[in-house]
Amino acid sequence: MALLWGLLVLSWSCLQGPCSVFSPVSAMEPLGRQLTSGPNQEQVSPLTLLKLGNQEPGGQTALKSPPGVCSRDPTPEQTHRLARAMMAFTADLFSLVAQTSTCPNLILSPLSVALALSHLALGAQNHTLQRLQQVLHAGSGPCLPHLLSRLCQDLGPGAFRLAARMYLQKGFPIKEDFLEQSEQLFGAKPVSLTGKQEDDLANINQWVKEATEGKIQEFLSGLPEDTVLLLLNAIHFQGFWRNKFDPSLTQRDSFHLDEQFTVPVEMMQARTYPLRWFLLEQPEIQVAHFPFKNNMSFVVLVPTHFEWNVSQVLANLSWDTLHPPLVWERPTKVRLPKLYLKHQMDLVATLSQLGLQELFQAPDLRGISEQSLVVSGVQHQSTLELSEVGVEAAAATSIAMSRMSLSSFSVNRPFLFFIFEDTTGLPLFVGSVRNPNPSAPRELKEQQDSPGNKDFLQSLKGFPRGDKLFGPDLKLVPPMEEDYPQFGSPK
């Protein structure tokens, strides 16, 4: 079973000092109460009180589309194109995060970040809008927020939950069109900040706790005094293995940090696990798809060399590389460590490096408000729990697969992983694990248990190898029955 939670918050501040905005009537209800229109509020709705008009200066305006164009269901071609764009954005984002992080293990939800940025794109104009579209690899089409919203609504019912909320400084004038689209596409019901930091923090953290089913207890520890708008979204994913691991087979084992050291881990095991896996043309990376129910997959990438970095691997990966045709499930002896990962980060520097520095300096967000706004913070937190629980496979499947020849796939060295929604191909989470048990003391390997990479790769000699660790294009070897080796993992 995999339990994942992703949370992201964008905060906006006034561009020049605190905002002094006079509003005769508060258009938002107090923090923590849902917007309603009672019998004494029939004359005008709360949203109408925020209407400042939809006329904007010349130039490219906020994301708009002809009536009905973006309300249609995504076509297979649009879904396919969006999945590839999201994969490219994921690689860009995670490569930069990994370059600057000193943490042994990382996890983030690129979908959560993309949703927040596409939410922002609803109110972005001119160069700000263009940069957002470029970073998200979305081209110039106006329907990105609508496509992401529609696809997220259809993701694995029961396993996937997306919650969003918008917090506003009391009385701050937000354009009605932005509020309406936020509610329609992201379910981000506007709630006003009280101005009392202690109360606001308590209420925000309570919402986060409820949205993540208690897995993120305290997300924010403080708010900038000049914060006028917060966008939060929380992703909750509970993935049950389609073929569960037998807890009685889980045992203490070694995870190889490098050529010299190991750490003890709880290793889940299965003797005949139905697994889709393959090697790339240069056999330094093993890739396996562990299926969840509800059309989700935990995709593991295990480089066979210890000397690798995330940027090297992701630079040569694409959606098509990780989703090859004609790769079928086969009975496999599997070892996979139980995991608990938690990582929180500020993405301001990372997004600036991607080309969005304008958001934090002088963005054009006049589709949100005529008041000058600047993004003051982008906080993200994700959590992953990986355990044995799943849904038992049908007995007929087990019997049929047990008649086939067995291979082995062992995740006992540093690896990357993705969680994909298989129907749409959207990457929900991405992460890397260098040390699944960082609190444990490192153990020195005995000499005979420390084979060199040359020895380790002898079992892969049936596959062509290139001269470089990671070549310019990682391609797949056509899978053939006789080409599946018995992996000789380090012990």
From Swiss-Prot:
Q: Give residue numbers for the site Reactive bond for chymotrypsin.
A: 404-405
Taken from the UniProt record, the cysteine pairs bridged by disulfide bonds within this chain are 70-143
Gene Ontology MF annotations:
endopeptidase inhibitor activity; protease binding; protein homodimerization activity; serine-type endopeptidase inhibitor activity
- Which first-to-last residue range defines the signal peptide? 1-27
Modified sites of kind Sulfotyrosine = 484
Cellular component (GO) terms are: blood microparticle; cell surface; collagen-containing extracellular matrix; extracellular exosome; extracellular region; extracellular space; fibrinogen complex; platelet alpha granule lumen
Tissue expression remark = Expressed by the liver and secreted in plasma.
Q: Which residues are glycosylated?
A: 126, 295, 309, 316
Q: Where is this cross-link: Isoglutamyl lysine isopeptide (Gln-Lys) (interchain with K-322 in alpha-fibrinogen)?
A: 41
The pro-peptide lies at 28-39
Fill in the PTM field for this protein. Proteolytically cleaved at Pro-39 by both the prolyl endopeptidase FAP form and antiplasmin-cleaving enzyme FAP soluble form to generate mature alpha-2-antiplasmin.
Keywords of this entry: Acute phase, Disease variant, Disulfide bond, Glycoprotein, Isopeptide bond, Protease inhibitor, Secreted, Serine protease inhibitor, Signal, Sulfation
Q: Which Pfam families match?
A: Serpin
Q: Where in the cell is it found?
A: Secreted
Disordered as annotated region, ranges: 55-76, 437-491
Q: Name one GO biological process term.
A: positive regulation of collagen biosynthetic process
Per the UniProt record, the site (Reactive bond for plasmin) maps to 403-404
Subunit description: Forms protease inhibiting heterodimer with TMPRSS7.
Q: What does this protein do?
A: Serine protease inhibitor. The major targets of this inhibitor are plasmin and trypsin, but it also inactivates matriptase-3/TMPRSS7 and chymotrypsin.
Q: Which disease is it linked to?
A: Alpha-2-plasmin inhibitor deficiency: An autosomal recessive disorder resulting in severe hemorrhagic diathesis.
Family, similarity comment: Belongs to the serpin family.
Q: What is this protein called?
A: Alpha-2-antiplasmin
